[in-house]
Amino acid sequence: MREADHVRGHRSALVPVSVMDINAFQRIIAQKYKRTDLQRGVPATFMWFIEEVGELATALASDDHANIEEEFADVFAWLCTLANITDVDLERACQKYTGNDVKGFKPK
């Protein structure tokens, strides 16, 4: 167990935390949904992704943290789906944010 990260400005009690890397989650999504996602195609899948982003926007305007969390998960799952059907490795793609040489990054 480790101490949970800051959430809304406060620390929660010690909770079990499962660590999963981006590739592991992307593989889970691919195993469950890739066949169907490929049949649906990129344009329709992108529309599902946008719908989930809209649901996240609505959730963010509320005080329902559980719903906000659920919608973040949905957005990330659909982002993984899009990455899977366009052959993008999200973990590799996100590595550009791990250094100081990110375009537009200005160290403080």
Where do the protein language model's features map onto the residues?
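Flexible "arm" and connector segments at domain edges
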Residues: 2-72, 76-108
